[in-house]
């Protein structure tokens, strides 16, 4: 079988067309420079590609998408370049088994199998025989080292990963070809173009503390940010702020730490009001909810927000929109002085978990009428811990705000996901 190979700067998955076709020489130059490019493999007489490969060495990433004759994506393969430049980790793979030619691409009822692998030998295999809404069976995948890793081919020497899926029994013959340019190839790449996986990105975090801003959380169509509440202060004499779930195992210390100047910092709640019809009251009522908490390091505005990473996180392994943060199985998080972490955590356990009635009020204080629950204080160092309620168990990202000069100005935790901004001037997002 002859496989035609063409190159482009990007691939538009919605329209299944390349963006900005390039010659093989330019693709080779981009490969050497680590810049992203795509490889499109086609067969004569077939409209849909056999497979498309996105290469971006600067992002440690190679992705392979396989298409069937109907133009539906059947397989996704995510390869990662780590410390050994000669091999790639098979980080993530998903296979979709469409039940017939009439089933739409990515149909929720499509059976699928997903496999995640990690360089330390761990992994997870999930089977969904009835699709996303059916039962899910999770097991540890049994794969050898050769199955976990694959050789990194040189430019122009990559195999057709989908040869078996397309029924090829003999190695294909590759022929270089020039891809046809789409009519809209001028200007910037469409936002729908395939890009290397990115970890979760910040939304309008600073705006959540700005009165008058209109947002939606997806459930409430319109919410209006009100003046943030200030709930006391937190002392961090060690200069290292801990953000963690105080209710889980901490053998290795707090989940997240952020260096800050030693000092005492304001604790805030971001709040938003919304109006809805209450069946009990039989009238419109207005409710104000806390949507985020923040430790304010400086009054300077945040120029950027970035998700904090845990000590063992490897950003090269992150999937699209993957989060990191602190874990909780008791719907609780905290800001604390990492230098006094152990004694502060012991006081938290004695006061909230064990309910010790004899705790000195100088070291343990309940906080009422707030998402902040309590404060503990280490008398030896002066360091403090302030626990706050989350809206459930799981992992909560920690967002670090920095000034134009790169200094930390705030550390925030969103309690119910990332809201979206609504247009100004009283126009709804749907208008």
Task: Please tell me what each predicted stretch does.
Residues 46-51, 70-75, 107-111, 120-123:
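A short glycine-rich beta-turn/N-cap micro-motif
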Residues 33-41, 61-67, 87-90, 113:
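A structural detector for short beta-strand units
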Residues 53-58, 65, 75-83, 126-130:
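Beta-turn initiation residues at beta-strand->coil junctions
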Residues 118-137, 368-418:
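C-terminal structured interaction module
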Residues 1-33, 95-193:
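Long terminal segments
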Residues 18-58, 422-424:
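N-terminal low-complexity, intrinsically disordered segments
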Residues 185-358:
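Extended, low-hydrophobicity segments enriched in charged/polar residues
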Residues 110, 347-383:
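Intrinsically disordered, low-complexity segments enriched in Gly and acidic/Ser/Thr residues
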């Amino acid at each position: 079988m002859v496989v035609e190979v063409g190159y482009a700067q990007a691939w538009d998955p919605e329209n299944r067309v390349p963006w900005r076709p390039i010659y093989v020489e330019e693709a080779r130059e981009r490969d050497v420079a680590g810049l992203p490019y795509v490889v499109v493999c086609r067969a004569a007489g077939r409209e849909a590609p056999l497979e498309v490969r996105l290469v971006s060495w600067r992002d440690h990433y190679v992705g392979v998408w396989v298409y069937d004759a109907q133009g539906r994506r059947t397989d996704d393969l995510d390869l990662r370049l780590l410390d050994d430049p000669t091999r790639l980790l098979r980080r993530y793979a998903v296979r979709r088994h469409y039940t017939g030619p009439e089933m739409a691409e990515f149909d929720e009822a499509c059976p699928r199998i997903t496999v995640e692998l990690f360089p330390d030998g761990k992994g997870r295999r999930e089977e969904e025989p009835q699709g996303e809404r059916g039962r899910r069976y999770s097991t540890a995948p049994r794969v050898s080292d050769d199955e976990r890793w694959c050789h990194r081919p040189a430019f122009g020497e990559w195999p057709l990963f989908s040869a078996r899926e397309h029924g090829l029994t003999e190695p294909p013959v590759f022929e270089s070809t020039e891809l046809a340019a789409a009519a809209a190839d001028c200007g910037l790449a469409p936002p729908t173009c395939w890009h290397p996986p990115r970890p979760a990105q910040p939304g309008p975090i600073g705006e959540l503390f700005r009165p008058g801003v209109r947002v939606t959380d997806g459930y409430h169509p319109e919410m209006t940010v009100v003046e943030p509440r200030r709930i006391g202060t937190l002392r961090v004499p060690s200069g290292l702020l801990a953000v963690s779930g105080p209710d889980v195992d901490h053998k290795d210390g707090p989940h997240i730490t952020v260096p800050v100047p030693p000092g005492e910092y304001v604790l805030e709640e971001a709040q938003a009001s919304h109006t809805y019809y209450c069946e009990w009251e039989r009238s419109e009522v207005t409710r104000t909810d806390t949507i985020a908490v923040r430790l304010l390091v400086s009054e300077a505005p945040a120029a950027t927000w970035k998700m904090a990473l845990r000590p063992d996180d490897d950003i090269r392994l992150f999937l699209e929109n993957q989060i990191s943060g602190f874990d909780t199985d008791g719907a609780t998080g905290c800001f604390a002085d990492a230098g006094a972490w152990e004694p502060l955590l012991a006081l938290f356990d004695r006061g909230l978990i064990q309910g010790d009635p004899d705790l000195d009020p100088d070291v343990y204080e309940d906080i009422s009428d707030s998402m902040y629950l309590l404060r503990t204080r280490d008398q030896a160092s002066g360091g403090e811990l302030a626990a706050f309620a989350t809206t459930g168990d799981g992992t909560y990202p920690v967002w670090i705000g920095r000034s134009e000069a790169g200094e930390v100005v705030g550390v925030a935790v969103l309690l119910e996901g990332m809201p979206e901004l609504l247009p100004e001037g009283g126009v709804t997002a749907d208008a």
